[in-house]
Amino acid sequence: MPRFTTLTPEQLEYVRTFFLMWGRLLIPKLVPGAHVVVASNPLLSYIVSGALADAGLERRGEIVRLTMTMRGGDRPKSAHEDFPEVSVMPRSMWEPWVVYRKPIEGRVQDNLRKWGTGGFRRPSRDKPFGDVILSAPTRATERRLAPHPSLKPQAFLRQLVRAVLPMGKGVVLDPFAGAGSTLAAAEAVGYKSIGVEKDEHFFDMACEAIPKLVQLTPDVNR
């Protein structure tokens, strides 16, 4: 939803209840130490995060997608000339992805040996995975292949998806697959993945778009 959308208390409670129930349903399907990463926005991330904590997952921080969008920064509606130096709210220049983990069994090293989970895969031995990822808006090339309203760029997703399987083994699950961009990123970095999408239109779009998105060579500096 647009970042500036104002939700009623009842709608906010619906969001909280949805992610609480979703988290509870998800936990039995996860191996110990598996990470859950959920894209959000600065206005709703606290609700999503609190619901996942209440569901029984443990908070492990946030991934910040550092990007400028077209949302926010506007002057007061119908009073632009009266308040030319005022922005109603900050223009969005980042996107929070909340990070949670199913509790591990014993120590991290024990969990890694048994389940292959519990941490994040480093970009290299000398460089840890960081919680800020520079990212340009999704390129027009990708949007033409997969015209989904919330399509994320491959340059960003491939870095994130690669990191969530610390041993490079396992299955990436996207329960809100949309046009398949996360699944394409998993395929591109050599991971197995499963996607779930209830919208038939977007399901068909994903079936067509995933092979094409996999073939893209994204600019990782974007």
Place the predicted regions along the sequence by residue.
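S-adenosyl-L-methionine-dependent nucleic acid methyltransferase catalytic domains
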Residues: 1-222
